[in-house]
Amino acid sequence: MSSAPTTQQNLAALPAPAMSDTGITSHIASRYHSHLPISTLSTQGYIAVNTYTNSAKGPNGGKDGSAMGAAEELASRMWARLGHRQENQAAIFLGESGTGKTTIRSHLLSSLLQYSSTPLSKKLSFAAFVFDSLTTTKSVTAPTASKAGLFFELQYDTGSSLHPTLIGGKVLDHRLERSRVATVPPGERNFHVLYYLLAGTSDDEKEHLGLNTGITAGTGNRSSLGTQKRWRYLGHPSQLKVGINDAEGFQHFKTALRNLEFPREEIAHMCEILAAILHIGQLEFMTSQSTTPAPDESGGYGHEGGEEITVVKNKDVLSMIAAFLGVGDRTLEQSLGYRTKMLRRERVTIMLDPKGARENADELARTLYSLLVALVMEKINQKTCAVEEAVANTISVVDFPGFADTSSTGSVLDQLLNNAATECLYNFCLQSFFERKAELLETEEVQVPLTSYFDNSDAVKGLLKPGNGLLSILDDQMRRGKTDLQLADSLRKRFEGKNPAIEVTSGTVQLPGANFATQNTSQIFTVKHFAGEVKYPVDGLLEENGEVISGDLMNLVNSSSSPFVAELFGQEALNKVVHPDDRNAVQQASVASKPSRMPSMARRRGGKAGRFGSRRGGDIDEEKDSDEGRARSVSRHRHNPKSADTQQGASAQFLSSLDNINKSLTAPNTNPYFFFCLKPNDRRIANQFDSKCVRQQIQTLGIAELSQRLKNADFSIFMPFGEFLGSAEGEVSVVGSEREKAEMILDEKSWPKNEARVGSTGVFLSERCWRQIVRAGDLGVVPMPPSDENPFNNPESLTPMDGKRGFGESKVHLLQTPGSAIYSDDKAAGYFGSRDMDAKSDAGASALREGDMFRNLETREELAEKGNEVTTTPIEERPKSASRVRWLVLVYVLTWWCPDWAIRIIGRMPRQDIRMAWREKVAINFIIWLSCAFVVFFMVGFPRIICPTQHVFSPSELTSYDGKNSDAYVAIRGNVFDLGAFIPQHYPSIVPASALEKYAGTDATNLFPVQVSAMCQGTDPDGTIDAAVQLNYQNRNYTGQNLISTTDNNAQYHDFRWATNDSRPAWFTEQMIFLRGHYWKGSVGYSPQYLKTLAKKSNQVAYINNRVYDFTDYIAGGRAPQYPPGEERPDTLPDSNFMDSRVVDLFSQRSGEDVTKYWDALNIDTGLRDRMQICLDNLFYVGQLDTRDSPKCQFAKYILLAVSIMLVSVICFKFLAALQFGKKNIPENLDKFIICTVPAYTEDEDSLRRALDSAARTRYDDKRKLLFVICDGMIIGQGNDRPTPRIVLDILGVPETVDPEPLSFESLGEGQKQHNMGKVYSGLYEVQGHIVPFIVVVKVGKPSEVSRPGNRGKRDSQMILMRFLNRVHYNLAMTPLELELHHQIRNVIGVNPTFYEFLLQIDADTVVAPDSCTRFVSAMINDTKIIAVCGETALTNAKASFITMMQVYEYYISHNLTKAFESLFGSVTCLPGCFTMYRIRAAETGKPLFVSREIVNDYSETRVDTLHMKNLLHLGEDRFLTTLLMKYHSKYKTKYIMRAHAWTIAPDSWAVFMSQRRRWINSTVHNLIEVIPLQQLCGFCCFSMRFVVFLDLLSTIVQPVIVGYIVYLIVQVATNPASTATTAFILIAAIYGLQAIIFIVRRKWEMVGWMIIYILATPIFSFCLPLIAFWNMDDFSWGNTRMVTGEKGKQILVSDEGKFNPDDIPRKKWEEYQAELWDAQTRDDAQSEMSGISYGTKSWHPAASEYGYAMSQHNMSTLSVPHMPHNGSRMSLLTSDNGMGMQQRDYSASDIDMSDMPNDDAILAEIREILATADLMTVTKKSIKAELERRFGVPMDSRRQYIGSATEAILSGQL
C-alpha cells in the first residue's frame, strides 16, 4: 500500500472506494502498524486505537501522533471555539470497554485544565482522580475500566475578559455499578479504592481498621499475617497483585482529598466505612434457634422460643463493623437477620435464612459504598461548583461505561441502563452528524447529497421515550407493585408489532410432552442495540429496579452514634419513603441513580451566544431541580392524588439524568466533539491488529457512514454574512452584496464545497476553514495567565508552571506497572504532576501520609462502647417495695464476694439492672443448691449421723456367711474375718480348702489358745503374770454347733502357749494384727436386750464404750495354771487373780448393763487403768454393742423407706385421680357463646390451616362460636412466601382488596412501643359444612416501626381480647381498635360482646378434637365454680427425633397423673396456653372473672425489669395467668378434662427443647414464690390438698437430687439386698407399674415403649435440664428499658424507646362511638365497615347493622340467647329476639322537618313489599332505608330506628 493513504489522518478525505468498513479498517491498520493510532473525522471526531503501550508516545518519540497529542489538539480546538465564539463545548467518548476511553479522557481533562492554571484547576484535577479511584476497576478487557457514567463540567465566564475564565466545575456521577461491591466477577477487581485501603495503610492503621486479622472468608480460621488473606469482596487473592501500585494509590488518594479540603477526621471516617464494607463481606451466617426469651417474643407458641433465626458466626468481625457504624453488635446482627419491605402498602418483616442474611449484608455494603461515593462527589461539587448565574459557558466531558452484551456481575439492571446510556449517546452522535444542521441547510437553500446510515432511533425511543418507553414502563410497573410476569405482559402489549427494536418472548410455552401451553416463567425481552442484540431476563428486574434499602437498615443507622454515618445517610442522594401519617417514620429508601446536580446548560431555556454584554447562557429553568436543597423524600407527594405511592426507581432516575445530559448536549450554542475508541484485538496484546475485531467496531459505530457524511457536508459552523465578513477583514471586496462578497472570499480560498458553502443569510464552514478565516491558530493554544481579578486565584498557594509542561507529564503511574506507561485508564498520568501541588496542600498531605490518620481519634474499642450506648429518656419513677429491699439485702449477703466492677468488666454487663439480675440468679442458685444439699443430707447424711454405720454381725448374720450361698466369714475373739479370702493364703498349703471351709459361719476362738502373760500385765506394777496362768474361753453368744470346741483336732496346730513344747508368746498377737489388717470385716454384735438375757443366765457380761467384755469364765475360776509335760506342779500355785477386784466387781454386780460411767468413776490410778484396759481388750473382748435395733437406728433405717412411701403415695393418689376420670361424660346440646382465640406469629400455612380448621369444625353451634385470630406483627417466617396475616386471611377467604385502616390500641411494650396499631377484619369461614364467624386482628404497628412492625409477643395478643372484654363488661372507654372490635362483633356479626361466656385459647400449631369445645362447656355448666379447664395435649410429631420421643410419655403422664390429681382438688396449677378454656364471667351474677380488673392489671404489667418479673411474664405467662386466677378467684376451681384432646408440636431439637424446659422450670420456681403467700394455700394442719400441690411444685427445685436419690437406692440395693433400700426401690419401681396400669386400662399399648424411652431419659429431665435452667435464669433479651438509681432509693425507669403518653390513644365509650357511627353512616354508608360480608356467602360488601349477615338459613337475629344480667351500661336497648337492640336517638320537630314524613303504617307496608321481592341473602337495613327514601322522596334518617325494628320484626315473624 502506498504511503499516501497511510499518512492521511482524515478518514473523510479518503477516496470513495476506500470509504467502506473494509477500506477504513485497512487504512486504520496501515496507520496502526506505522505507530499512528489516531485518525480523525475531519475536525468533528477522532478515532483512537488502543495500542496497549505508552499513550503519550508517538511514532517519533514525542507526543505527536499519540493519544495524548490528540487529546491536547482537541483541547486546543475546544478552547479556541470557547474563546472566539463563546460556544459550549462537549467531548463525548464512545467505544467498548477496554478501548482506552478513560485514559484519553484523563489526557483531555489535563490539557483543558492547563489553560487555567489556578488552585481551582488543581482541585478539579484532584476531583477527577478521586472520582476514578472510587468508580474504576480492573476488568477482563481493561486494567482500569470505568463503572460509572461521568459528566465532567468545566464552568467558564466568557463575558468579563478577552479570555475564558475557569470559575467552577462539576463532577456528575451517573449510575455507579453497585452490584460490583458485593459481587466481583472472576478475573476482575472491585473498585480500586478498596485495594488502596488494604495496601496503603500503616500497621497501626491496619490494627485500628481490623485489616490485619487474617480472617479467611468461608472458613472463619485465623492465619498469620504473612499468609494471603481471602477477602470476599476483593475477589481472588491474585487480584491483589496485578501490577497496580495500590499502596502508592492510597497515598495519592488521601493527598487528593486533603487538597480538596477534606479534614483529616473525615478522611479517617471514610476509611472506616471502607473497612466496614470489607468486613461485611467476611460475615458468616448460620441458622440458630431463638432460645433467649425476649419481651416481644411470640416464639412459635408451641415451640416456646424455638423460632429459627439467623445469627452471625464470627462475632469479632461483627463487632468491628458495628464499631465503625456506631451501632450495637446485637442491633446490627438483628438487622441483618430480617428485612422489612413494603408489600401492598404494608410493612412486612421477612425472617431471613443464612442466604438471605448474606444478601442483606451485601445490600448494606452496596448502600454504604454508594452513599460514600455520592457524599464525596457532592462535597467536592460544593467546593468547586460556581453559582449558576455566573456560568456563561461550559466544557463538558461525557464518558459512560462501554456497551456490554453480558453482565459481568449478574446485574441485569446495570447492564440495561448502561447500554441505554450508550444507545442514547450514540444516537446523539448520529443526530449531530446527520440531522442537526439539516433543517438549517434546507432553510439556507444549501443542497447536499443525502447519506444513508443506520438509525437507532427505534431503540432509543423504545428504551427512553418518556411515559411509554421501556425504562418508563419498568419504573411504572415497579411503583405499582406488579410482578415480573406482569411486566413482561406490559412490554409485550407495548412493543409487539409496534417497535422493531424490542421483542418480548411469548407469555406461554409448550413443554416437551405436554398437550397444553403453560405460562412461561422465564420470559426475556430482546433489545436490538446499535452494537448488537442483547437478551434481558425479566426475572427479578422489578425488584432490582427498586433497589430498596429496607427500613431496618435505616432504623439501624438512625441509632448510630457516628456523626459521619448520620451524615452519610442524611444526604439528598438517599431517597426516603416516609409514612404519610408520620414524616419521621422512614419506611424504606434507595440510593439515587442520578447525580444530585444537573448540567448547567440543561437548566437553561436557551439564549443567544454573545461575545460581551449580558449573560448569554439563557434563563435558568426554575421548574427543574436546583443544585441546592433538592428534596429527596417522597413525603411531599404523598397527599397529591396524581403522584405515585412510591419513589422513582433506578430506571426512572437514570432516564431523567440521561434526559438532562441530552438537553445539555443538544442545547443551542453547544458544539460536540466525538472520540471513537477502538481496541485492536480482544486479548489486550500490543502490536497485534485483528482486522475482524476492528472492522466489527467500525461497523458498529458507523464510521464509514460518518466519513461519507463528512465527505458530503463537513459543516460545523454557520456564520451570518456580517460576522463572516467581519472575520475576513482585509480580504473583503468593497463592492457587491454581502452574499457576493462572501462568495468571492470562498472562491479566493478555494475551499472544497463540503467544507464551505454560501447560504441565503450566511456561510457554512468546517472548523478548519473557520480557524483559517479567524486565524484561530494563535489563540487558545497557550495557557492563560492567572488574572488578578479572578476570585478563585490564590497567589500565595500557586506553584509556578510553564505552559509547555503540565499534568500530562507526570511520572506517577498509579494504575499501571511502575516504569511503563501502558495505554490504560491512567488517572495518575492525567492528574498528578511533579509540580502541581501548592505548598499548603503539600504540608497537609505529607502530615497525613507520615502519621497515623486515626491518631487522637477514638479507638475501635471506644467506638464500640459508644455504639452500644443509647440515649435514654426517664419514663417512670417508683420506690422500691419493702419486700424487694429485704430480698436485695439477702442477695447481697449471698453475693458479697463478687464486687460490682468484676461483674461489669469480666462479665461484660454494663447495665446495673442486668448486674443485679445476675446477682439474684446467683443468690437463687445458692438457695436452690443449699436446698438440694439439705435434701442430700437428709437422705444420706442425716441417717448416718443418727445411726452411724456399724460393722457388726449378729449370730444369725454370721451363720449365714457359711460359704455355701455367700461369703465365708469366721469369728475369733469378737472379730469377724473373711475366711474365703484367707483360705488361699493359709500356710501350709497342703491343708485342703475343704478342711478350712467347715469353720465358715462359726466362732473359731478355741482354735487359737492365748498366752495370758503375753497379753496382759496384771495388777502388779512390774506387769508380770506367771506364765502358767491360763484363761478358758466360752462364747455365750453362740449355740453349741456354732462354737468350735477346744478339743478340735486343729487347735493343737495353733497352741503356742508356755505349757507346750513350742512356746511362742507373741504368735497370737502377730496373727491377729495380720488378720485385722487384711481380712477384718467387723465385730460380733451383742444387742442390749441379749446382754440382759445373758445376765439373767448368770453371765457376767457388760459393755464399756460399746465394747462388750465377758468375765464369766474368769469369775467362775477358769484360770487353772498349766505346766509343760514332765514339769512338776509347785505346791504353791501362782496367783491367778491378775485382774483388779474392783474391775471384776463392776462386771459381776452390773452384768448386762452399760458400765462406762462406772468404769470412768473407778478410783484407780492411771497406770493400773491402762493395764486393765489392755487386759480387757486382749482377753475379755467378745464383740461390739449392736444398736441397729435401737429406735433411732430404726428411724434412720426406715427414713428412706418413708420418703419413698411419701413419693409413691402422692403418685398413688394421682393414679387414683386418673382412674376417677375414667367415666365418660355425655355432652349436651349447649347454647353458650364462646370465643376461640388463636394467636399467630410465624407459623407455616399448613399449621395455621390445621389449627383454624380444627377450631371451626368443632361440634358446637357455629352461630355461637367466634373464631378470633390475632396476628402478632407483619412478619414473613422462614419458609413462608407471605406474611403470616396474609396467610391467615387467605385461609379465611378475605380478598386482598379488603384493606381496613389501622387503628390505635394499647400494647405491652417499652416506652413508645406501648402505642400499637392494628387492623380488624371480620367475616365468615366456611369449611366442611361449617360456617363460622371470625375476627382477625392484625398488629401492624405504628408508622414509625420499621423492624418487626406490630410485634409485641404472645402475652400482648392475649391482652387485646382480655382488655377488650374487660372494658365491655365494665363499660369503660375503649381505644379505636376496641371500638372497631365492638362494632364488628355487635353490628356485623350480630352478637353483643357481653353474651360471650367462655374463651377457648389454642395455639396456632395446635389441633383440637371435634368434641373438645362441647366437653369443656359441658363441664363448666355442670359446675359453675370452674373458672378454667384444660384437656389432654398429645404430640403430632412424636417420631420426629429422639428429643420428641422423650417427651411423648412425659406429656401423657403429666396430664393423666399430675393434672388429674390436681384437678381432684380444683387446683390445676398450670393451665397450658395451647389448649385451655376460661370462664369470662360468672354464670349467676355476670361478674367478670377471667377479665376482671385485678387479673387484667396484673397480667398487663409492662414494667418487667427484675429477674422475678421476667421469669413470670416472659417465660411462663400461662402458669402466671393460672396463678393470678388462683390468687384473685380462690373460690373457683381449675380443672382437667381427660376426654378433651388436642395435639401440638413439641421441640425436635436439643436447643429448642432445652429452651422450652428452661422456661418451664424457671417459671415454676418463680410462680412458687407467688403462690406461697396465698392465704388459701394451706388448710387445717396442712391437710388441704393444695399443700400437697405445693410440695409437688417444691420438688421442682430439687429435681437433680431425685436422680441422685435413685442412684443411691440402686447402690444400696446392690451392696445390701437385705436392706430397706430394696423395699424403697421396689416401691419407686411400682410407680411406673401404676402408670402402666393407666395406659393398659385405656389400651394405650404404645405407651409401654414410650415409657422405656422416658426412663432412659430421666437423667436429662431431672438432672441436666434443671441445672442448666437454674444457671441460665437471667438469660434474657433485656430490651431497652432499664433502672437507674434516683434520689432516696427510688428507681427511675428509663428507655430509649421514648416515653409513652396514654393521651396519644383516643378513648371513648361505646355509646358515644355508636352515636358517631350512626351519624357517619348517614353521611357515608360505607364508612368503617370494610369487612362486612353477607352471611353464608363470600361476597364482601358494607354492612351497617346486625343484619349484615341476614339470610334465611343462618339468621343471626333468631338466636335464642339466655337472660343476661344488666352490666350497668347506659345503652338503651330495643328488645328483639336476640336480646339486642340499638341506641335510641331522639329527634325533635325543631331539629327535623317531619311535615312530609310518611306514617308508620305506610312505612311498614312498603317494608313488607320490599322484603317480599328482595334477596334475603344480600338485603340490609340500609338498603331498605335507601329504597324507602327513593319511594317516598324524603330523607328517612329520623325514622332509622323504626325501619330497623320493623325490618327485624317482619323477618322474625313478629309482624
From Swiss-Prot:
Catalyzed reaction equations: [(1->4)-N-acetyl-beta-D-glucosaminyl](n) + UDP-N-acetyl-alpha-D-glucosamine = [(1->4)-N-acetyl-beta-D-glucosaminyl](n+1) + UDP + H(+)
One GO CC term on file: cell tip
Transferase recorded as keyword: yes
Chain residue ranges for the region called Actin-binding: 658-682
InterPro entries referenced in this protein's UniProt entry, alphabetically: Chitin_synth (IPR004835), Cyt_B5-like_heme/steroid-bd (IPR001199), Cyt_B5-like_heme/steroid_sf (IPR036400), DEK_C (IPR014876), Kinesin_motor_dom_sf (IPR036961), Myosin_head_motor_dom-like (IPR001609), MYSc_Myo17 (IPR036037), Nucleotide-diphossugar_trans (IPR029044)
Cystine crosslinks: none
One term of GO molecular function: ATP binding
Stretches the record annotates as Disordered: 585-650
Keyword Magnesium carried by entry: no
Family, as annotated: In the N-terminal section; belongs to the TRAFAC class myosin-kinesin ATPase superfamily. Myosin family. In the C-terminal section; belongs to the chitin synthase family. Class V subfamily.
Record protein name field: Chitin synthase 5
